[in-house]
A protein has these predicted regions:
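Cell-envelope and extracellular/periplasmic
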Residues: 1-193
């Protein structure tokens, strides 16, 4: 939690830490699994008068490490945080997700999936943003739209608005009536979601 306000250096530092341990311990590229920082309202611990840093940037940096470091994986904990408690009570969720990573990536157990979808690219068609993911072949298509404060889109003005989203195969489609020409989309871009 101490790095929540230094996301801009986190991916490089964490990558060096893992590679340093591997070099020091001379065990090769041993599996390295870690937990995403759980959502929390960092405004609670921010000094009065200071800007509240958005920990979504740290979660993004943590996700990048998984793609930089061979034989690593991140257990996503977006649904396991506590708004007013920096140490979430849902420890079993974290343990189970780490175990799934080990089962699939280290031991090659088939029929279980420990990896979460990872952003690949976006395509914009008219008023809709189509988001493609890696590791998303397990999704079920659904035509039902759902609105959520967790999905937001912005136009050229970079003002984000809540959006509707739906799934088609391994893609997430996102749009907002307030943004006729979207250029960006974001998901769970708050400290606590």
């Amino acid at each position: 939690e101490d790095n929540w306000n230094r996301a801009h250096t986190y991916a490089d530092m964490f990558t060096r830490l893992i590679n340093g341990w591997r070099a020091e311990w001379k065990q090769g590229d041993f599996p390295f699994y870690y937990c995403q920082i759980a959502p929390y309202d960092y405004g609670i611990i921010t000094e009065k008068g200071k800007e509240v840093i958005n920990s979504a940037y740290l979660r993004e940096a943590q996700a990048k490490v998984e793609h930089r470091v061979a034989n690593s994986g991140m257990a996503v904990l977006l649904d396991a945080g506590m708004e007013k408690g920096i140490h979430p009570a849902k420890k079993q969720v974290a343990g189970e997700r780490l175990a799934l990573l080990a089962l699939t990536k280290t031991y090659g157990v088939e029929g279980v999936n420990g990896e979460s979808p990872y952003y690949k690219s976006i395509e914009i068609k008219n008023d809709t943003v189509i988001v493609s993911f890696e590791r998303a072949n397990m999704w079920i298509s659904g035509k039902n739209c759902f609105e959520s404060k967790n999905f937001q889109v912005a136009g050229e003005d970079k003002v984000f608005y809540p959006a509707k989203a739906w799934i088609e195969r391994s893609k997430m489609l996102v749009k907002s009536d307030k943004v006729p020409h979207p250029v960006a989309v974001r998901y769970c871009f708050e400290n606590y979601v």
